[in-house]
Structure formats: C-alpha cells, structure tokens
Amino acid sequence: METENQKTMEESTKRKEEKKKRSRVKQVLADIAKQVDFWFGDANLHKDKFLREQIEKSRDGYVDISLLVSFNKMKKLTTDGKLIARALKSSSVVELDLEGTRIRRKKPLGERPKDEEERTVYVELLPKNVTHSWIERVFGKCGNVVYISIPHYKSTGDPKGFAFVEFETKEQAAKAIEFLNNPPEEAPRKPGIFPKTVKNKPIPSLRVAEEKKKKKKKKGRIKKEESVQAKESAVDSSSSGVCKATKRPRTASEGSEAETPEAPKQPAKKKKKRDKVEASSLPEARAGKRERCSAEDEDCLPPRPKAKKRAQKDGVGQAASEVSKESRDLEFCSTEEEKETDRKGDSLSKVKRKHKKKHKERHKMGEEVIPLRVLSKTEWMDLKKEYLALQKASMASLKKTISQIKLESEMETDCKAPTAGSGQECSTQEKVSAQGPQFVTGVIVKIVSGEPLPGRKQVKDILATISEVVYIDLLEGDTECHARFKTPEDAQAVMNAQTEIRKKHSWNLEVLSGDHEQRYWQKILVDRQAKLNQPREKKRGTEKLITKAEKIRLAKTQQASQHIRFSEYD
C-alpha cells in the first residue's frame, strides 16, 4: 500500500512539474512574425541585396527557414525552425510551403519607389549605443516607420551618431521634421555629420572620450568647491581674528614690549593691522585698570612724556571705535551672505522641483522633448554634395603644393650637381639599380658559424671595419650567411683578416668560386624578381595624396631637427 501511495505522489509531482514547464511563447511568436515580415517587406528587400539574391536564385521564390535561423537577430529570438513556421502561419506578407520548411512572399516584389528620398529623414545628435527600437519608439509618434538605417564604424562597431528613418508617406516625414527637430544650444550651427576615418585603422573608442569628459567635469567641480571653501575660510578667519582681538585683553606692558627698538622691523601694512588689534584689546581692559591702577599708573606703564601718552590714548580710542564698526559690518555682511546662500539654495531646489514636475507631466502626456536635429534626406544630400566639393578643392590644392615641393627639390638637386660627368655617373648608377646587381667574380664570401649568427646589421658592422659591404644575405637563426662586397679586393682584405675574425667570433670564411658562385648569383636574381613581382597595395585618390603629404611632412620635420653646422669661413 505504501509503495502504491508513493508512486501516486511521484506521478502527481511530475504532472505539476510538466504544467510549470509550459512556456509562454505568445510574445516570441509575435516578435518572430514582425521580424520576418520586415525582412520580406518592400522597404527592406529593395535595400537588402543578399536576401533579394537568395529569393531570385530559387525558381519558385521560396527561401529555406534554416537561412533565417542563421541571421543574428533571429538567433536572439529562437533557433527552432518549427517555432518560426508556427509564427508565420497567419502572416500577411509571407506564406509557408506544404512541408513547412520554406517561405516566400505572397506578392511579387515591384519596382523601387521614386519618392523614397522624400519620405526619408536624416537624424543626428543621437544618443550613444542607439538602437532600432529606440528610434522606432521616438519616430513612431509621427507616423508608420517603414525602415531605419543606423550606420556603424567597421573597426569598432560603434554607431556614427546619425541615422536615416523612412516613413510610409511624405506627410509623416514632414511631421517628424516639424515636431522632432529640437537641436540643443551646444550643437554645431551647420547640420550634417561627415566623419573622416582612415581606412583599416581603429577609431578611438567612445568610452575614452566619455571618461575624458567626466574627468574634466570632476576637475571643474573640485575647483569650484575649493574656491567656495577658500572664500568661506577667509570670511571665518577674518571674523575669528576680530573675535580673538576682542576676547584676549593685552596689557600695556605687552604693547610696550612690541614697540621696543630691539624687535625686528615689519612692513607698514602688518604694523597697521597689529595696531588695530592692540587698540581693540585696550578699551575692554581699560575699565578695570582705571579702578585698580589709578594710583599705580606709573608702575603699569613705562616712563614716557605726558604729551605722547595723551596722543596715544586718543589714537587708541579712535582705533577701538573703527574696529568695533568693522566688526559690526563683518557680522552684518556674514548674516547677509548666509541669507543670500539660503535664498539661492531655496531657489535652486524650487527650480529642480519644477523641472521634475514638468518632466513627469511630459511623461504622462507622452510629449518627450529629445534634443535631436532632424532634416529631410534631400537637404542632407545637398549638404553632402557641398562637403564633397570642398574635399575635392582641398585635395586639388594639396596636389598643387606637392608638385611645387617636388619641383623645388629637383631644382636644388640640379644646383648641387654642376658638372656633366657627375650627372652621367648618376644615370649609369640608376640604370644598374634598375637592372639589378651585375655578375662579378670573387666578391661573395660565405660565412659559417657553429652557433646561430647575430643579426644582419651586427654582421655587416663587424665586416665594415675591414672593407665596404654591399649586402648580407642572412635569415634569423641561421648558422650560414653570404656577404657581397663591391670589389674582389674588398673580399680579399676580409679573407686576409680571417684569423682575427675567427679568434673573436669563431667564424669560418670562404670566397665562393666556380659552380657555387654561379648558383648563388642565379639565386640573387630569382629572389630579386620574386620581390619585384610581389603584389603591392594600390593607393588611389585621396588616400594616395594624404600618404604623399605625410611623407613630405616627415621629411621636413627630420630636416628641421638636424643641426646646422657652420664652417670657420662662413
């Protein structure tokens, strides 16, 4: 009985789990249908070359559902072909075949509409990482959005900051321009973003720019806070100074000590301040002193002439009255400042409250004001033409300056070469370099080492101390290499110094001759031909001009950085 009860309990739990597992696919089915209807819609197929070609390839216009599963947007929704077929059963744009594995358009694709540009608007000043759904939500208030294009950078994948939105009718596009064109005050006056990027080079990420902006803002806030704190501390110090002066009564003996000639001299401003503080301390201590020291005035104060004493007393009285006035003014100012700061704080808080209230009201009403610049695509096309014309003119001027620089450099070289003989020598050298190295016997030295040889430069530097080296044929990590010299005499000079080289570097040297020499010369010619036949990256148009200008700029900077050495006779 117990076993039967356990079995029934297990079955009931399994049924409950099965019921819980029931997936809710209503929203997913709706999203799949919407996405496929968009892909096979007129607006997308006129622009989507790949999908149009796939439809044209098949005889009856059917496309396999597995192709749709390979798309990234469909992967996010589902990878189940049956679920896609289930979602497209009630579609108004596409239809399934009998097996339910392929789909096609119900109506054939017509010609591309002529008013496409008039129905499209250009949008800039978009938020970073903008999405199609966000644009559809914002522009959907003005009409039915048919197509959205958000250009991205190939290297980083970041959006370029602008987009194109196509509406169903011209009126809807005009409405979007009227209601959504609200550019902020900081925005540039002239619309149209035409970002210039270097080909195959990464673009600095948007995060870096954001971080820089944040750092700048933080610095500005810190500076403001510091200035406010400094002002407050200055006010506090001035008020505390006055309070200290009134609290601490200084005796006449302290005053007399300060006025002795032994004390170091101070500037006039400091003296005045000190006198004021002393004066403020004296009147409070006076009342008590009159009672106590009426008879003992002579003991309290140092012996001085009577006239001086009277003058000092008068001065002290005036100073005391001035200080008391100043202290009152300070207190009044401080209270006024506090009141002003309180008023400002209240006003700021009120403004913030009002702003929040308005924002909430807008959200309730659905009137969200977004700082965007919206204009028609035809207007944007005119701006693009203007930009291209400017670019063309600037490139033409750059080309002109490059040609002028070339002419100037040629003129300089002509001035430097006055004799005809030197010119002939140069021409012969150019011909030789064009043809390649000519066969000369006894100029190639083979170097063999027990260990891997150092770099090409190091080997060349070692041999160059004995005679001039033309070329070193060496690959990294090799134990053998070939050194080509200008003349057989140079090669022989190296062979004569073989014993010294062997002691220092443990290299074995040998001059090539006979078949070995001929084979090596053939190898030289083959390697040279292979190098010349290598495919080179062709640079055309603006890219070619910019690279030329960059080379000239680098050459000029190098020339400017060189030291000018004057001879004794200059």
From Swiss-Prot:
Cellular compartment(s): Nucleus, Nucleoplasm
Provenance organism: Mus musculus
Phenotype when the gene is knocked out: Embryonic lethality between embryonic day 17.5 dpc and birth. Conditional knockout mice lacking Larp7 in germline cells show defects in spermatogenesis: males are sterile, whereas all females display normal fertility. Cells show reduced 2'-O-methylation of U6 snRNAs and defects in mRNA splicing.
Record SMART domains: LA, RRM
One GO CC term on file: nucleoplasm
Modified residues (Phosphoserine): S253, S256, S294, S334, S347
Protein family according to the UniProt entry: Belongs to the LARP7 family.
Protein name: La-related protein 7
GO MF terms, alphabetically ordered: 7SK snRNA binding; U6 snRNA binding
Stretches the record annotates as Disordered: 1-24, 180-364
Domain xRRM stretches: 438-551
Residue ranges constituting the HTH La-type RNA-binding domain according to the UniProt record: 22-116
Basic residues biased stretches: 213-222, 350-363
Residues bearing PTM N-acetylmethionine: M1
Keyword entries, A-Z: Acetylation, Differentiation, Isopeptide bond, mRNA processing, mRNA splicing, Nucleus, Phosphoprotein, RNA-binding, Spermatogenesis, Transcription, Transcription regulation, Ubl conjugation
